[in-house]
Design a protein with these regions (language model features):
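PRPP-associated nucleotide enzymes
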Residues: 1-193
Length: 193
């Protein structure tokens, strides 16, 4: 996990570029290699010297070998524009259709204003939402609720590489059937790792 990875650009006037500051600190230690698992964006990889990124599709493959039966999945869901590139790679790797979603967030409050499902889902099936980080989980909870209400999706799973789960899992399980994380930050018997 790369701290401050989501701060890959200043969000407001007078913000520091926190990711750049952190990467400068790591670079000052002169490591011969720095390995990141599923970096939030290419910005973090570019700011670190001698950096290797293990991509999300490789990490997810480790779970599909042991825990997650990818043959049970009918759709890969990209929860926002930032996840499309990685989700596309996963959809292509497992030969599944990609469904792209779009959220609008109020930068001042962090709350999601809107959620739209951009691609049609015409047949019932099981969906896997994929992303790099889950902090509190509101994004995924709102998306899962929209998918269940507005599409014929019958079951929803969530895969995140870095599962912070700062608000626990109870709210997520209101709308999500299975949760998978490569690096969970909490212990919970309902979590698949």
């Amino acid at each position: 996990y790369l701290p401050y990875a989501r701060h890959d650009r200043p969000m407001h006037n007078f913000d520091s570029h926190a990711l750049k500051v952190f990467c400068n600190l790591i670079n000052s230690l002169n490591f011969t290699s720095v390995i990141i698992h599923d970096c939030h964006s290419d910005v973090g990889i570019g700011l670190l010297n001698n950096c290797a990124n293990v991509s999300q599709d490789i990490l997810l493959s480790h779970l599909t070998d042991n825990i997650l039966n990818i043959n049970d999945i009918d759709y890969i869901i990209a929860p926002d524009n930032g996840a499309v590139k990685k989700a596309s790679k996963i959809a292509e790797k497992f030969k599944l259709p990609l469904i792209t979603c779009l959220k609008e967030r109020d930068l001042a409050t962090g709350h999601i204003i809107k959620y739209r499902i951009l691609d049609p889902i015409e047949k019932p099936g099981k969906a896997l939402i994929v992303d790099d980080i889950c902090d509190g989980g509101a994004t995924f909870n709102i998306l899962a609720k929209s998918l269940k209400e507005d599409t014929p999706i019958t079951e929803i799973s969530l895969y995140v590489t870095h599962g912070i789960f700062s608000k626990g899992l109870n709210e997520l399980f209101e709308n999500i059937d299975h949760i998978y994380s490569y690096h969970p930050w909490i212990e919970d018997e309902r979590l698949n790792t």
